């Protein structure tokens, strides 16, 4: 998963 840090979480917000 790519939900550990803000930049990546924001990009995958609908997928995290």
UniProtKB/Swiss-Prot annotation:
Record-listed Cysteine amide modification sites: 16
Disulfide topology: 2-8, 3-16
Region (Ser-Xaa-Pro motif, crucial for potent interaction with nAChR): 4-6
Main localisation: secreted
Source domain of life: Eukaryota
Tissue: Expressed by the venom duct.
UniProt GO molecular function: acetylcholine receptor inhibitor activity; ion channel regulator activity; toxin activity
GO cellular component, one term: extracellular region
Locations listed in the record: Secreted
InterPro entries: Conotoxin_a-typ_CS
Keywords, sorted A to Z: Acetylcholine receptor inhibiting toxin, Amidation, Disulfide bond, Ion channel impairing toxin, Neurotoxin, Postsynaptic neurotoxin, Secreted, Toxin
Domain-level remarks: The cysteine framework is I (CC-C-C). Alpha4/7 pattern.
Sequence similarity: Belongs to the conotoxin A superfamily.
Function comment: Alpha-conotoxins act on postsynaptic membranes, they bind to the nicotinic acetylcholine receptors (nAChR) and thus inhibit them. This toxin blocks mammalian nAChR alpha-3/beta-4 subunits.
Protein name, per record: Alpha-conotoxin AuIC
């Amino acid at each position: 998963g790519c939900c550990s840090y803000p930049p990546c979480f924001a990009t995958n917000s609908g997928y995290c």
